[in-house]
Amino acid sequence: ALPEDSTFPLLVPRGFADRMAKGDPHDPLLRQVWPERSESVMQADELSDPVGDLSARKAPGLLQKYHGRALVVATGACAVHCRYCFRRHYPYADDTAAAAGWRGAVELIRADHSIHEVILSGGDPLSLADHKLAELTDALSDIPHVRRLRIHSRLPIVLPERVDAGLLAWLRGLPWPVALVVHAN
């Protein structure tokens, strides 16, 4: 049975679930998404923000941990709740670039000439519609010191149909070298 008090409930696309071995509680695909009761108990050595995102926040939806690059939390939406997600406690409702209309994040990137690489992350940025992705990257394309784009996504693995003609056309039309970092197990 699923834990009743899960703040990070089971969420998995049907196509990904269809690839799981039915009746096998040890199936590796199932283990990636199945909530365990122990997850709701914070251990003494655990952190709710294990990668320091909140201390790296520069504006709503903009994180900067390293010189030369900035991470845009493009959305809090994701097609799957992976049990190992290090942003499960991230305050997406209050702190995404989309919630702020991109403007603040884009303007801070524009003002910081040391930023040459922008990372789109989230949630999962490919959860956004193509026109929303284009809206964000169009705003970023006006910044001459941005020279590279990275997109971090799990959707090509759990929802491969998201990689469609529209998404590929958007990717081909981007003015920078693009690295699509696919989160796979």
Which residue ranges define each predicted feature?
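Flexible, acidic/Gly-rich N-terminal and inter-domain linker regions that tether
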Residues: 1-65
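Long hydrophobic alpha-helical segments typical of transmembrane helices together
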Residues: 179-181
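Conserved Radical SAM active-site core
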Residues: 34, 42-46, 50-73, 83-177
